């Protein structure tokens, strides 16, 4: 029997839903041209199998970009990071039959100033998802 893996679209939608609900800011998968900041932008950077003895699992690595309003100060981007980490301290919600096994904050990967003068941070998360159980007969 073949198991269906979680669609990357479904995972990103679950991340966006949680971030938007708890930060009250938009979380895009593609930022429209000239979109006003502050905002979040989420993208999957890696999908890796992580099967155990009893479960079929994949680890989805997601980079969430925190883009603050233009300012010489970093306070705006720090607030975005703090709000994101607070929002994702709650587990994302996945549809049946998928089960979120683990949601890991891998921390801030980089903070930089874009050409536009906006502060831009990248926060990395891993989502371990079970999509079936291994049964030995």
Language-model features: where?
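Charged, amphipathic alpha-helical segments and their flanking helix caps
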Residues: 1-30, 46-137
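Short acidic/glycine-enriched loop/turn segments that link adjacent beta-strands
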Residues: 34-37, 117
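A short, hydrophobic beta-strand-centered structural micro-motif
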Residues: 37-46
């Amino acid at each position: 029997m073949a198991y269906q893996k979680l669609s990357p679209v479904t995972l990103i939608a679950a991340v966006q839903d949680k971030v938007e609900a708890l930060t009250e800011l938009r979380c895009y998968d593609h930022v429209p041209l000239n979109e006003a900041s502050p905002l979040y932008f989420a993208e999957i950077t890696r999908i890796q199998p992580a099967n155990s003895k009893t479960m079929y699992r994949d680890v989805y690595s997601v980079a969430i970009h925190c883009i603050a309003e233009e300012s010489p100060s970093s306070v705006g981007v720090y607030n975005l990071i703090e709000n994101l980490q607070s929002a994702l301290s709650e587990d994302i919600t996945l549809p049946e039959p998928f089960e979120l096994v683990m949601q890991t904050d891998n921390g801030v990967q980089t903070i930089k100033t874009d050409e536009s003068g906006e502060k831009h941070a990248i926060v990395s998360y891993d989502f371990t998802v079970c999509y079936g159980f291994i049964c030995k007969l």
